[in-house]
Regions:
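Helix-loop-helix hairpin linking two adjacent transmembrane segments in secondary transporters
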Residues: 147-200
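Cytoplasmic helix-loop-helix junction between adjacent transmembrane helices
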Residues: 112-153
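Central cavity-lining transmembrane alpha-helices of secondary-active solute carriers
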Residues: 60-75, 279-293
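A late C-terminal transmembrane helix in Major Facilitator Superfamily
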Residues: 360-397
Length: 450
């Protein structure tokens, strides 16, 4: 994965790839905390006498605060930096995961999941911004794919791991194990991560290679925090990215929360068997994420292909493959169902690193966290909607068919947004003093006076 590079005949060390691996491990553990509920759901449903609609609400509990805090988390990240926000976030999500162990009913589990959503809100924006700092543009796709693929790979190893723990020790231990892993990552991040300019283990040769290759400049914008937010919300490019990535998020979170339950209910599998089958689409997604969304993009750009065309081609084609979810509505055979879901998730996973690399590619200086926060806010509103809508549809129809059809329609809207609204993948100019003055004037004239 880490490949040797040279500058003026000098071999460039690979400290940046160690940081990329650290970020990937963080997302992997982060997602263990998310998927453990989907695995433990059958036991918890029985223990607390919960309906499918109740489970849909529990699945969404994480996403309400997680989504609502995305923009504040992005602003906070741009103000205080990757190092501080990353450390506090890692500590708090370990603490929040541990709280779930002691929940005693629907209300306790809902509250614990909501706290986890608060704690993990800065997670992906931190990884996106850190990747922008640490990697030149020509390596950005693979670097982004490392942490994004970790989210998919968590379902390959996390679902079976948590399933074994849940079956043998009960659902509470499923949450306890992920809490311990979260605290271990906090210690690793505390010891290892620094921004490039402050990392004593980063050689001058590699720092020069990173900076001259178009890495995102460290530092803050001259615009105020809220001035940057207001400025970015006027940009069509930001809205195109936001709508498109939200559409991706609906299908992703539907599968993340409901896939094991779909296999248990529709295909009549046990918890352990459903965990094994559910791992297959996520394994496919991990491979396409790294190979297509990561390596292939960097390879084509390095060979001189147009950057916008390459990234957009993978983005849109991946979303089109996501429409294979329609195929799963036409079968009751578990093998064919997994086949269609694997194609859908594989396509979405190939598109995802492009989406996550875009904030560091299009944002003005000091605005990466804010763009990432806006994008991930909409993405995780779908994380709220997908499990709730799916739960109510399944409860009303006793079938997942219409739930999958809804996901396909939303994907089609996202494809249109990426193609026709977002435009070229180019950096948005920094806001000027005139932009700031205009924003303030607009704010004053729109404020009622008495």
């Amino acid at each position: 994965m880490a490949h040797a590079s040279e500058v003026s005949g000098q071999r460039v060390p690979n400290r940046r790839w160690a940081i990329g691996l650290l970020l990937g491990i963080g997302v992997l553990i982060n997602y263990f905390d998310r998927i453990n509920l989907s695995v433990a759901a059958p036991q918890m449903k029985e223990a607390f006498n919960l309906s499918p609609a109740d489970m849909g609400l529990l699945f969404s509990a994480f996403f309400w605060p997680y989504a609502l805090l995305q923009v504040p988390a992005g602003l906070f990240l741009d103000r205080f930096g990757v190092t501080r926000v990353g450390r506090w976030g890692a500590f708090l999500w370990g603490l929040a995961s541990a709280i779930t162990v002691f929940a005693s009913g629907f209300g306790g589990v809902f509250a614990a999941r909501a706290v986890l959503g608060i704690a993990e809100a800065p997670g992906f924006p931190v990884s996106s911004k850190a990747t922008g700092y640490w990697f030149p543009r020509k390596e950005r796709a693979l670097a982004t794919a490392i942490f994004d693929a970790a989210a998919k790979f968590s379902n390959v190893i996390g679902v079976p791991l948590v399933a074994v723990v849940v079956v043998n020790a009960g659902w509470r231990w499923g949450f306890g194990v992920t809490a311990l892993l979260s605290f271990a990552y906090f210690i690793a991040f505390l010891v290892i991560y620094r921004d490039p300019s402050k990392d004593s283990k980063l050689s001058p040769v590699e720092l020069d290679y990173i900076q001259k290759g178009g890495a995102t400049p460290e530092g803050t914008s001259s615009a105020s925090v809220f001035g940057m937010l207001g400025y970015l919300l006027t940009k069509t490019k930001v809205w195109g990215l936001t709508i498109g990535f939200a559409a991706y998020g609906y299908s992703f979170y539907l599968f993340l929360t409901w896939l094991p339950g779909y296999l248990v209910q529709t295909m009549h599998m046990s918890i352990l068997k459903s965990a094994g089958f559910a791992a297959i689409p996520w394994a496919v997604a991990t491979v396409t994420d790294l190979v297509v969304g990561g390596w292939l993009i960097d390879h084509l750009i390095a060979r001189g292909k147009d950057e916008t065309r390459v990234r957009k081609a993978v983005l849109v084609t991946g979303m089109l493959f996501g429409l294979a979810v329609f195929g799963a509505t036409q079968t009751v055979n578990p093998v064919w169902a997994i086949f269609w879901i694997s194609i859908a998730l594989g396509g979405l996973a190939a598109a995802a690193p492009v989406g996550w690399s875009l904030p560091s590619l299009i944002a003005p200086k000091g605005g990466v966290g804010t763009v990432g926060g806006i994008m991930n806010f909409a993405n995780n509103l779908m994380g709220v909607a997908a499990p709730i809508v799916t739960g109510f549809i399944v409860g009303a129809t006793n079938s997942f068919t219409n739930a999958f059809l809804v996901a396909g329609v939303i994907l089609a809207v996202g494809i249109v947004s990426f193609v026709f609204v977002m435009g070229p993948i180019q950096a948005i100019p920094e806001p000027t003093d005139r932009d700031e003055d205009a924003r303030r004037a607009t704010s004053k004239t729109s404020t009622p006076t008495g």
